[in-house]
Amino acid sequence: MQIGVCYYPEQWPRTMWAEDARRMAELGITHVRIGEFAWSRMEPRAGVYVWDWLDDAIETLAARGLKIVLGTPTAAPPRWLVDAVPDLLPARADGTRWNYGSRRHYDIASEAWRAHCVRITEAMAQRYGAHPAVVAWQTDNELGCHDTVPSW
């Protein structure tokens, strides 16, 4: 049986990653999902990609034989994007906008959000698409969670 876990290396000091990977492998974990909420770490400013931490996380996990399910970070647009495109935030039925800060803080009908999703996903695919440890991709996360499907 193959068993997977979610892991958020961006939330932990790098000094913990190797020990976490060792424990996962020791417990029989085979797959680790990472990345789905890390857009602000991958692209802290528009068009400025920072991959070193993700490169290191993938290599650290792969060194223990763990396979990677790489999540696109589209479930958590970064602050700079929301500031640049305020109507990217979802609106309630009464027209008031959500605040920035929770996951899924975007309107699925937003063309700007979709265009930026294509851009970050293509950048990730170029960098990690042929990586031998990346065995699957997760596109977005929890569609419909937090009542995010209605678009007003």
For each predicted feature, which ranges?
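An acidic-aromatic substrate-binding cleft motif
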Residues: 1-16, 22-23, 27-30
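Structural preference for beta-strand elements that scaffold enzyme active sites
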Residues: 2-4, 31, 67-69, 133-138
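The substrate-binding groove and active-site-proximal loops of carbohydrate-active enzymes
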Residues: 3-14, 35-53, 99-118, 125, ...
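Aromatic-lined substrate-binding rim segments of carbohydrate-active enzymes
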Residues: 18-98, 122-125
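Active-site region of glycoside hydrolase catalytic domains
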Residues: 59, 63-65, 77-152
